[in-house]
Amino acid sequence: MKRISVDIGGTFTDCFFVWDDRYVEAKALTTHHNLALGFNEALDLACKRADLDRVTVLSEVDSVRYATTLGTNALIEHKGPKVGAIVTHGFEDAIPLSRGRGYGEGLDYSMQQNLPAAERPDPIVPRAMIRSVKERINSAGKVVARLDPDDVRSVVRELVNAGAEALVVSLVNATENPEHELAIQEIFLDEFPPHELGAIPLLLGHQVSGRKGEYVRATSTIIDGFLHETMFHALSQLSQNLRDFGYDKPMLVIHNSGGMAQMNSTDALQTIHSGPIAGVGAAEHLSSETGVGHVISTDMGGTSFDIGLVPEGGVKHYDFLPTIDRWLVSVPMVHLDTLGAGGGSIASYDRIHNSIKIGP
């Protein structure tokens, strides 16, 4: 058995590979401008320890598995493109209002007990970047009000002219009938063809999440759109780098559900927490091998600290409506708690509020 596993975090890139009966690990600094460079450095160090070379390893290895917290860190630090959202007319404020729970979502229990002192998180999509189109599909999937193509063109142009670098579409009841979301996509591609310079991605809510619930589907699509380019470029760099050195198999990406898939079968949203969740899977295996009943899995990087549980020798806790950072989404994942503080966090004194702040 020959496998390579790589975990790229905000600070370090860790490489671990199994080569028949040998187990080798190595670490290098993450190179954010080109993630492949840090990966190559870690892999070369591991190869040196095993008396192998990179080309031999990549041409003979059975699989390369990739996990990361890059998406998690980008969301926590709000590093991403300017996103515009298109929703059904009359639902423009559904996202900012966040079902009336935005003040408490993602906070611990003690902080939720004092909601008057809580603050809403900074929006990924500000209200000024939300536009609506006149259309309506009922809960049975029947078209009640037809979509106006001219209205769509006007809205799309407004968002692009306002500086949108990614667009998301989340219409009411689109999971029952995606006709209008698909029509918006067709109009958008006609207005802004993907082969032209400056082309921007457009994501559809019913494709990102096929579950009911307008708000959680919208937030899921927004986060996916916010992270799409970041994760696409990161994964593409790594995939091309592997091919350049003789790896001719698909690169596998760890999902936050605990499974894995090829890059072209992975949404950006599915990569959030994939690094520490892969660690939870390893803790489950360790529990099984050693007979230890309960295991706590922790993953402290330079940017975040993640905690997972393996009670009674198995992963039993899944979130079907998890909160990622401060946002409720509808993508099922292994339960994990994340703190926005790690080995590289900086403490500072806020003179105005007379408080200590720690974080990225």
Model-derived segments and spans:
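N-terminally biased helix-coil "hinge/interface" segments that flank
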Residues: 1-360
